[in-house]
């Protein structure tokens, strides 16, 4: 289940946005929307130094905790651990580094606005998807209280 918190004041945080933006049906989308991932500043420099380019694949992970619907409301299960879990991927189809091109061609993406104009990138997807939960996607080592202690899935071997 994916949703935006109705309690979060997005207007007060204009640079807060979906990134990666790979969920086609989460918002009303402009007709020219494509899945994309924006990076800027130090993160963009790190990706450049790592030679990340067309054809490479990003694996996306986040912190997740098991939930349940109680009395019609979604809530966390008491005592359920917070774990790092892979939730999606994106194969890079194009890398846009020119701010003017980003602003004109991808004006719907938050990285097209001025705060992101220093060392800015948008990675356009060739192919992407999200995953349904599977134990094989859990990065946090089983029975480990610290979520940052990982046991990499076998497909990393």
Residue ranges, per PLM feature:
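Short N-terminal edge-element motif at the start of the domain
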Residues: 5-83
């Amino acid at each position: 289940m994916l949703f935006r918190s109705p309690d979060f004041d997005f207007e007060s945080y204009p640079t807060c946005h979906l990134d990666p933006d790979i969920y086609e049906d989460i918002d009303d989308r402009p007709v020219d929307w494509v899945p994309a991932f924006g990076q800027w500043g130090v993160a963009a420099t790190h990706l450049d130094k790592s030679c990340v380019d067309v054809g490479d694949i990003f694996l996306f992970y986040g912190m997740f905790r098991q939930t349940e619907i109680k009395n019609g409301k979604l809530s966390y299960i008491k005592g359920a651990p917070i774990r790092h879990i892979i939730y999606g991927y994106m194969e890079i189809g194009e890398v846009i580094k020119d701010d003017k091109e980003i602003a004109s061609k991808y004006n719907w993406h938050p990285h097209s606005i001025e705060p992101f104009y220093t060392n800015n990138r948008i990675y356009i997807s060739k192919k992407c998807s999200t995953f349904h939960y599977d134990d094989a996607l859990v990065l946090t080592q089983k029975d480990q209280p610290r979520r940052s202690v990982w046991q990499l899935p076998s497909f990393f071997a």
